[in-house]
Amino acid sequence: MTVEVDRPCRVPIGLHPVFSIPEGGAVLSVPGARDGMIFPAEVEPGVSRLLPGGKIANLSAAPCMDGTTLDLTQLPLPCATEELVQIHAPDGRALLVRRAEGITIAMNWNAAHFPDVVLWLSNCGRTSFPWLGRHVAIGIEPVAAAFDLGTSISAGENPINAQGRPTAINLEPGIPFETWYRIAVLEQ
């Protein structure tokens, strides 16, 4: 992937692949994943369950507002919800095992460019059009960004770049930004 600009800028950057979750379910893993953070507000007010701004040490035990935890590796989730979490992913890869279909979706990316991955867990929590409470999917979104909070937050000081992880990149005219990612479907 190549990005070219016509004026100097400092911007967040990310990819937005989204995968459906089949009826037979799926298991998510992010090898090498380290600390993570829950979106700082309810993604879908009154529906989201994770603790806004909460820390995640393990994807299988994300803290909820009611004091319980939610396993984000076993999909679909057991409740209607919409969630965003950002995980440090220094290995630049994620796997989505879809056992009933006998496949694994393997995603790899340049972790030097995209040090984190945002997981968008859409689990029947949005009832407005076009989702209508039927959308069951996961976005596995490599980023150099502070969630999807925009340029001013990502390019400024924020809790993610305070940990030493870039949340924006500098782009210059005449100097293309080149990166790569790969999505593969593997038979089990």
Regions found by a protein language model. Name each.
Residues M1-V5, Y181:
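Short, well-ordered beta-strand segments enriched in hydrophobic/aromatic residues
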Residues E4-P8, L186-Q188:
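Short solvent-exposed strand-capping/beta-turn motif centered on an Asx-Ser/Thr pair
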Residues V5, P17-F19, A144:
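Short, flexible loop/turn elements at secondary-structure junctions
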Residues R7-L15:
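Short, hydrophobic/aromatic beta-strand segments
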Residues V11, P22, L132-R134:
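A short, structural micro-pattern
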Residues V18-I21, G25-H113:
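Active-site/ligand-binding surface loops and adjacent short beta/alpha elements
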Residues I105-Q188:
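Active-site pocket scaffolds in enzymes
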